[in-house]
Swiss-Prot record:
GO terms for cellular component: plasma membrane. The chain crosses the membrane at residues 155-175, 209-229, 528-548, 583-603, 619-639, 671-691, 695-715. The gene is mdoH. The keyword RNA-binding does not apply. PANTHER family: CELLULOSE SYNTHASE CATALYTIC SUBUNIT A [UDP-FORMING] (PTHR43867), GLUCANS BIOSYNTHESIS GLUCOSYLTRANSFERASE H (PTHR43867:SF5). This is Glucans biosynthesis glucosyltransferase H. Keywords: Cell inner membrane, Cell membrane, Glycosyltransferase, Membrane, Transferase, Transmembrane, Transmembrane helix. Its EC number is 2.4.1.-. Pfam families: Glycos_transf_2. Its main location: membrane. Involved in the biosynthesis of osmoregulated periplasmic glucans (OPGs). It comes from Pectobacterium atrosepticum (strain SCRI 1043 / ATCC BAA-672) (Erwinia carotovora subsp. atroseptica). It is found in: Cell inner membrane. One of its GO terms (molecular function) is hexosyltransferase activity. Belongs to the glycosyltransferase 2 family. OpgH subfamily.
Amino acid sequence: MNKSTSSLDYIEKLPLPAEQAEVLREKLPQAAWNDQAVLHQALSEGSQPEGNQVNVQAEDDVALHSVQARLEMAWADGLDNGKQLGTDREGRAALKAMPVITRASMFPDVWRTNPLIRWWESLLGRTVPPRPHYSPEEKISENRWRLVGTIRRYILLALTLFQTAIATWYMKTILPYQGWALIDPFEMAGQPWTRSLMQLLPYVLQSGILVLFAVLFCWVSAGFWTALMGFLQLLIGRDKYSISSTTVGDEALNPEHRTALIMPICNEDVERVFAGLRATYESVEATGNLEHFDIYVLSDSNDPDICVAEQKAWMELCRDVGGAGRIFYRRRRRRVKRKSGNIDDFCRRWGNQYSYMVILDADSVMSGECLTSLVRLMEANPNAGIIQSSPKASGMDTLYARCQQFATRVYGPLFTAGLHFWQLGESHYWGHNAIIRVKPFIEHCALAPLPGEGSFAGAILSHDFVEAALMRRAGWGVWIAYDLPGSYEELPPNLLDELKRDRRWCHGNLMNFRLFLVKGMHPVHRAVFLTGVMSYLSAPLWFMFLVLSTALQVVHTLMEPQYFLQPRQLFPVWPQWRPELAIALFSTTLVLLFLPKLLSVILVWAKGAKEYGGAFRVFLSLLLEMLFSVLLAPVRMLFHTVFVVSAFLGWSVQWNSPQRDDDATPWSEAFVRHGSQLILGLVWAIGMAWLDLRFLWWLSPIVFSLILSPVVSVYSSRAALGLGCKRAKLLLIPEEFNPPRELVATDEYCRLNHQRRLDDGFMQAVFDPSVNALASAMATARHRFSRAIEDVREQNVREALNRKPEEVSNNQRLALLSDPVTISRMHYHVWQKPEAYAAWVEFYQKLPAPHIKS
């Protein structure tokens, strides 16, 4: 970039055919080759409507004149013949990235978690019953399935408690110290307290073991019966109460009921996000029902480079599919309440323009048939508030992700169908790949912060379970369409990335349990809060169970036994050990844990195993996944234990988006994260080997998994091993054997997007004419003239340019990007006076040119 020919260099950066570029050069007198004002005036000729000139407040605002012209040069096909371009009140060019706002009121109710206050208010008649929103016929239908659901859940409770009672009794009989025969209270009264403590210690340990065993076995038992009923449901193939059976599947969509597909994102993989979005859009278009849908990308990204890359990817998507006026993009400047706040903001501004909304995750892909089916189900069931699809995991290559994909694809349908069997219309909502009725969501599902102070107060982290509970509290059904195909998601590529996500989920579920006693919550959703807590609390309970079992073994081995407790006692009192009952209980527990997996494979065999690699390979995959789960279970146990403890201690939880792409774990990070587990495993194993080698064999699956945790974490994160399994047709899933067109298209568009990806987006927005025009037209801080605002703008631009680019903070960059005036002034200065800002020019010249296709 040369000062004397800066305008000519600028023209070379414009995406113009050679002939048009030459015409533009000829327009400029040689004396004006270094005058950016003349260049931008020449560019803007004919692009600004008469009487609609930019209100220029300073000499360096001249780049604002040519924003529209530069946009039309770069993305003319994405502007819908100029219909997507407009101007703000100061005449500056602005892209219509979002529709006109039609505000709706959405405010939360204060949480009332004190049961005594609730009881007092009920005595005063202050309880508000759910508003009736359905006809008498619909009420009869709902009462029918609610009665069936209640009966089923009582059966589940009875089966679980009965099974747990028997197992706990067995556990009691196999523990060595039966009854209190070895304790003589009168003797203990006259002996030192330390001796009494040693006599009581085995019984205290046994009691703790028994309580923990009962809780953990009850948790395992509930999962077993859920999977078993799901197996029977899928094997029979008919479900009288399946919500999917309420439509034929070819009904015309009601034109009065429009649907918004909304995708909240935050610092995600831009190329993958917009590839999946394009595949979903084209699939909807192929159904012939595109006019019923709009798409919203709702960004909470705070990385300036990613923000600019999102804007460019959105514009390219609109151009590629002709989606102008149907695909919208918004980036929030005030990130309030994370994802739930982002959705709430959409509902307040544009929600009342739609009857339904479908929530998508950044890695979600949905077929047009699935989306139109969800809309038909909503129209056929006017008392349904949320219908959750069952997303299938796919698209990953690492060994870890492929094991998880296989597990969720093979075992997941059993548990999802089982959940539906027990819950019916009072079910789960997982926060994505689900359709929501917008009006009741606005009226009932705004989330107030939890009252109080500490780590369990403030904004709700895991909003999905709470929103489902509030929807049901208002009288609307929450269903799982477990048998609806065409819904897909991706999983974290390695163990450490999954655990980052689990830490946030753990904290969120523990927070949600504060709502267990909130007024009006349905018992099923109180149980959902409880199961959410147990998903993570079971880890420290299991760890405590192992610690107490180890301590009991230490006491039993090292403490000198007393067989004669009284003078002249004829027969000794022996501690009891019944190995046959121990083996029976151990075998029963293994059956509860692994039978659902075997039933899943039996179901695959019954339905056809070809898409899983064949009957033999699917069985080998089962064994491989079981080995993998055995190795990882103790590792997750310790991590989840730390998460639970840290949540109670108030340690902060960062809002980090999970990694969405294949990513190998380096050895250094593995030893940092798993080093303490390796040491614990070694100490535990050596101690048990010295104490009693027989007990080490029982403990070996735990301790050796901990010792091997760094190795397993690293090698399972390798894509080479995962792809090797894929070539051997191991851990194969139907989406790989016969890929749906949506997933094929997603991979294709992902490769295309990577070819034209935008790196260092902020620097490109400062220098590149096309990217700068886009950033300026999409900036949202469009203030009227004010001297105070002008002073702030001048200060922001001056401070940024007087530093090196790498010294400008993210917050400063975001402030510059958010104002069309400041980003245009930056653009003008670096081109008008390149010698004054050599550090910026030098940085920019090292960057690859952005891919701009006119």
